[in-house]
Amino acid sequence: MDVRPLAQGLEFPEGPVALADGSVLLVQIAAGAIARISPDGTKTTVARPGGGPNGAAIGPHGKCYVCNNGGFEWHAEGVHRRPIGQARDYAVGGIERIDLETGNVECLDRVAGEVPLKGPNDLVFDVEGGFYFTDLGKVRARDMDRGAVHYAKADGCFITEVAFPMVTPNGIGLSPDEKPLYVAETEAARLWAFDIIEPGVVRKEPWPSPHGGRLVAGVGGYQRFDSLALDAEGRICVATLINGGITVISPDGRHVEHHPMPDPITTNICFGGPELKTAFITLSWTGRLVAVDWPVPGLRLNYAR
């Protein structure tokens, strides 16, 4: 695949969102900021929520909804950096709503019931206007949280836990018919599916499923899964760490193919362009946003601008 650089010098980019004008919205986790990358590569800061803005999605009324993980500590190697655990000044994670015109940041959710959100990571809106999101949790020197999937309404009036416990749940996406919900676990490098009964309610598989999900695929060797997007034919495109690239998995898990990228920390993918056949991919170790011509159109997201 021909990889075309769009922007460089980004501070651990993630959460790309393709906009109708050809620009790409993304987060810079290490800078605590949201930026817009124009087609010519110009970077404009949109908002500075602080903490660790992670996944992003456009929701109702054109607002940008962001999973904020609360922040990381960082290990630097020359110009490169990678997260190594919970920030020293970490307080809590949460869901934030950002006005892209003014940069105003509103906090929507900090708890789910009586459980604090630890490290919200990625989110996807359904056709009803609510959104599913992963809470990966936080990693410390000697222990780590067990993660969960939640469902919330865009106005902040409702949130419920959908699945627990999970091992570092990260990327999340809905199938074209919004029946299966897909969740990627980072450390286990597994892709799970949850069959949706109604918004915020999924059918639970019996034991030995640890959380009620149905295993779609796992990959061998030392690899880790990050965020994901679906194509129009229902295949799940998972950003893959260590073996840097995009792993494409069929809905039944029988077909798995890997598209290498020039970065071991390939963290996220979204689709844009006139026919949704341009994949925008964040290469976080090297601080770049790149574009790739994709053989299949991406799935159009609800509320896409």
Describe each PLM feature range.
Residues M1-R305:
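Sequence-structural signature of mature extracellular/luminal beta-sheet repeat domains
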